């Protein structure tokens, strides 16, 4: 293949549009420049596979933003980055990163360009972030929606509130949706240790108090589901409904071993067993944003926080304690969840009389990161809204 043809293919693969269309003005004004760009750049280093297309667009976006004065080209690379699966919040983080090395004026300009491109692409606004002081630590709460019933989302062990981001936009239509970081995670990393499920349930109440919410629809996934159940046991009057995703009402023998492994073997050793427990093989092979996000969070996790969280989860003790729970309850299990299996989750449902049990086809443990559309459909049908 000739170098210029390789350049055309590389450009269209990165940007999604033919080079002739994107560089029409350049080709008319300076055919030599047009050929130089295609041959020297897109037919050369940008056509090689040492860096993925996603990595190249992240790098190109950062470089053009740092150079400054090239807004049209920056916008083109932002669109290319979106095409390569870079998430909107990653592009915003990239602009923030530019501030460290290229200064605030260029970073602020990059934020403007990113925002304009996202708006033009119809990408919803990012959730509003609030810093909230709880009894003995600070946390971060993300909010989408400003009217309607309140919904609070509690994430899985090992991640943070962004686990819910793929479903928050959908759920926020006619609802106020709050996703927060619980102790030892995200904005609440390093909170006082050790802690218990009761502490975590009190923190959930503290988040609701901070926003003046007396009663909420409570949704939890995995350990977040354990927190949700504990909160429902202690404060049933504050729970308008309960949605339990990929969770358990009793501890597993493996929990202590996972805590010890984090302390002894370090976090790099947790990546393979954790991600293969959370995702399907095709998702791991595709390596989309959800897998990358989860992998990086596990890798960066403080081993002390990791161990404290598993030991808290080891103390989950709600089995049979919701037998008299009156609020509507949804139990949502992934067909391909080999951690909190359909057998485990059907037991949870059986011990909450009147609950609705639903199996999501082809879905693993980390439901919102691999099959967000199925989760959003199920929760949107279950949760009331003002529309």
What do the PLM-derived regions correspond to, one by one?
Residues 1-54, 83, 106-126, 271-275:
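Acidic, glycine/proline-rich low-complexity segments that act as flexible tails and inter-domain linkers
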Residues 138-193:
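Conserved HGGG/HGGXW glycine-rich cap/lid loop of the alpha/beta-hydrolase fold
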Residues 165-169, 178-220, 377:
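Active-site loop/oxyanion-hole signature of alpha/beta-hydrolase fold enzymes
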Residues 229-234, 238-271:
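Flexible "cap/lid" loop of the alpha/beta hydrolase fold
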Residues 252-254, 266-323:
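Conserved alpha/beta-hydrolase catalytic His-Asp/Glu region
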Residues 325, 331-333:
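Short beta-strand/loop motif that positions the catalytic acidic residue
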Residues 336-340:
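Acidic catalytic loop of the alpha/beta-hydrolase fold
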Residues 363-372, 376:
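Catalytic histidine-centered segment of alpha/beta-hydrolase-like enzymes
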